[in-house]
């Protein structure tokens, strides 16, 4: 595909130009695309060039690079390869996590919006707890996490993941219900 060429060989990489890009992973049953778009708007207002991949498209700055569902590893790869990107905002869908794992080994932040009763029976997930465990995988690689504490299943699953040591303790959960 001309939009997404094969990875270059080591001799073809401009190594002095390679640098870490701040990265945010966004997952959840609903609100992922809206969240990456909101973050992109904030980054642009701060004078940064965001790259985002979502279930709608890949966007670098104001340039729509491609349309379609790019919420998996191929979308993340396309964003991270673009030299214009100053911050990567990666919508991370459940299906991509279950089929291929996370597209990155580390992230600066992860956002989990919520969990809902959808896609049951696909890829070994049969209940809300399984969906929550899948979504919370993004927290395993993130330095900071924003978790919707008002989603009870997500909150309970987060506590269990923390007890198992899979996710570091989250000290500041925003819960408007208390």
What are these regions (language model features)?
Residues 64-149, 154-155:
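Flexible active-site lid/hinge loop adjacent to a nucleotide/diphosphate
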Residues 64-66, 161, 165-166:
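Active-site regions of enzymes building and remodeling cell-envelope glycoconjugates
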């Amino acid at each position: 595909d001309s939009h997404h060429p094969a990875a270059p060989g080591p001799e073809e990489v401009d190594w002095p130009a390679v640098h870490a890009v701040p990265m945010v992973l966004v997952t959840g049953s609903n609100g992922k695309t809206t969240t990456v778009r909101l973050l992109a708007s904030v980054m642009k207002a701060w004078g940064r060039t965001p790259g985002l991949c979502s279930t709608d498209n890949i966007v670098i700055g104001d340039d729509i690079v491609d349309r379609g569902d790019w919420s998996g590893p191929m979308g993340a790869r396309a964003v991270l390869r673009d030299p214009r990107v100053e911050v990567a905002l990666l919508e991370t869908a459940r299906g991509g996590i279950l089929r291929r794992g996370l597209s990155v080994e580390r992230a600066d932040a992860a956002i989990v919006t919520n969990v809902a009763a959808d896609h049951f029976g696909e890829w070994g997930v049969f209940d809300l707890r399984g969906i929550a465990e899948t979504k919370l995988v993004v927290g395993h690689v993130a330095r900071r996490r924003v978790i919707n504490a008002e989603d009870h299943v997500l909150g309970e699953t987060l506590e269990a993941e923390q007890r198992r040591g899979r996710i570091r303790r989250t000290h500041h959960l925003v819960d408007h219900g208390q």
